[in-house]
UniProtKB/Swiss-Prot annotation:
The chain crosses the membrane at residues 37-57, 81-101, 111-131, 134-154, 264-284, 302-322, 331-351, 359-379, 390-410, 416-436. Lysosomal dipeptide uniporter that selectively exports lysine, arginine or histidine-containing dipeptides with a net positive charge from the lysosome lumen into the cytosol. Could play a role in a specific type of protein O-glycosylation indirectly regulating macrophages migration and tissue invasion. Also essential for liver homeostasis. GO terms for biological process: dipeptide transmembrane transport from lysosomal lumen to cytosol; protein localization to lysosome; protein stabilization. Keywords: Lysosome, Membrane, Transmembrane, Transmembrane helix, Transport. The lineage of its organism: Eukaryota, Metazoa, Chordata, Craniata, Vertebrata. A motif (Dileucine internalization motif) lies at residues 10-11. It comes from Danio rerio (Zebrafish). This is Lysosomal dipeptide transporter MFSD1.
């Protein structure tokens, strides 16, 4: 099992260097020594900012929902195509991205290539707005999506390669925190940027929208630089620590998918059913809060971003909590139930929506910290890239279909029916969590073990 091969943890800087990778033959400054805590923290910083630009630009349409619809003369269903076109390529390419990381490019070159796709895609997206061609904007989102989700696979694989062990949940939480910092900044800043450009141009329109989106592309350039630096540091660590000696030597095959366990397939179902109730809702949330609660556009953007605002500081804290307690399945169940309650409050009550959105932010963070690391517990290490890629792939199949469905439901039936639709998806996720718990218990698996028990299992005999 993957959880039996412990790597050095993030907080274990003083562990005996003879356990695991070979120590450097010469004395190095702590921040330059791959075995030292300071160096691994440096790597973690670049690892976290790797997805900053992608997350910042992913929700550009959500933060500019009213402006995009007005400037490009769209209905809601057409607007949601911007999210669908992001997701469609990853139904296949995200899975292949994990395969390419494992067999073709390697983690370092693959990360740089995917970062380039993100940057080029955002530039095409902005150019489409400048030229007033919505089809070109969709092309940009398509290219952006090819890089965005595959980059997330690379980020997850980097995390496991460097920090697999008892702090892996914390590292996943920190990664999510920094990525969601990008989403939060986007939600609260890009509208202001649009307003300033509108004042300078003298009017709104496609040109104003295009310039705003082109400015947003600078964050993707920043993430590309992080990918280059991270690749250099990883290559250097491989040379110093002779990491190649510790590789399994096994060659991954695409046919390995048929050997994925029932537990892994249930994790995939939870992932899809849960996230289709999060991202499409945020994509359409601005107008929802304006129409139902009478918020101004500025207030609507603020509350629509609260999920990301909360997840930024909460993710590492909740990741640390999951690390120390274990019981991943129970934490996932709690997150799904809390999210279900949040959507029910938004759908059927007029309570202050800050309550529901705050609960949604906490539960979203908790699920990410508890769900994604479970993949490393149920697949061999040499298949991690493919497993994470497949997880992202079917997630994007769900998001592509549900984004179009959500836009159509909203145009025809309104927000109440849309919320009922999201609630049904969460009920499916809850059923999958219950089945995962029962199957893991029956098979005496390790997904719901306490942290102490899991640590004992991981120690060599």
């Amino acid at each position: 099992m993957a959880d039996r091969e412990e790597h050095q943890g993030l907080l274990d800087g003083d562990r005996d260097e003879d356990e695991g990778d070979k120590a450097p033959s010469v004395h190095l400054n702590p921040i330059c020594d791959p075995n030292h805590l300071l160096h691994r923290i440096l790597v973690l910083i670049f690892m976290c900012f790797l997805g900053f630009g992608s997350y910042f630009c992913y929700d550009n349409p959500a933060a500019l929902q009213s402006q995009v619809i007005q400037d490009m003369n769209l209905n809601t269903a057409s607007f949601m195509q911007l999210y669908a076109w992001y997701s469609w390529p990853n139904v296949v390419l995200c899975f292949l991205g994990g395969f390419l990381l494992d067999r073709v490019f390697g983690i370092r070159l693959g990360t740089v290539i995917f970062s380039l796709f993100v940057l080029v895609g955002q530039i095409i997206f902005a150019a489409g707005a400048l030229a007033n061609h919505f089809w070109l904007m969709n092309v940009g989102r398509f290219v952006f999506g090819i890089g965005g989700e595959s980059l997330a696979v690379a980020q997850n694989t980097y995390a496991v390669n460097w920090f697999k062990g008892k702090e892996l949940n914390l590292v996943f939480g920190l990664q999510l925190s920094m990525a969601r910092l990008g989403s939060t900044v986007n939600m609260n800043v890009i509208g202001w940027v649009y307003g300033r450009i509108q004042m300078s141009m003298g009017s709104a329109g496609p040109t104003t929208l295009g310039i705003t989106l082109m400015i947003a592309a600078s964050t993707c350039l920043f993430s590309l630089i992080c990918a280059l630096v991270l690749g250099f540091l990883d290559k250097r660590a491989e040379r110093i620590l002779n990491k190649e000696q510790g590789k399994t030597g096994e060659v991954i095959k695409l046919t390995d998918v048929k050997d994925f366990s029932v537990s892994l397939w249930l994790i995939f179902i939870i992932c899809v059913a849960y996230y289709v109730a999060i991202f499409p809702f945020i994509g359409l949330g601005q107008v929802f809060f304006i129409e139902k609660f009478g918020f101004t556009p500025v207030q609507a953007r603020a509350i629509n971003s609260v999920v990301y605002i909360i997840s930024a500081p909460a993710s590492p804290l909740l990741g640390f909590l999951v690390d120390k307690t274990g019981r991943n399945v129970m934490w996932v169940m709690l997150a799904v139930i809390t999210t279900l309650l949040s959507h029910m409050m938004l759908a059927f009550t007029f309570w202050n929506p800050w309550i529901a959105m705050s609960l949604l932010g906490v539960s979203y963070s908790l699920l990410a910290c508890a769900l994604w690391p479970m993949v490393a517990f149920v697949v061999p290490e040499h298949q991690l890239g493919t497993a994470y890629g497949f997880m992202q792939s079917i997630q994007n199949l769900g998001l592509a279909v549900m984004s179009i469905a959500a836009g159509s439901i909203l145009d025809v039936r309104g927000y109440l029916f849309l919320e009922v639709f999201f609630i049904a998806c969460l009920c499916m996720a809850l059923l999958a969590v219950v089945l995962l718990y029962l199957f893991d218990y029956y098979k005496e698996g390790g997904l719901n073990l306490s942290a102490a028990t899991r640590s004992k299992r991981a120690k060599p005999e």
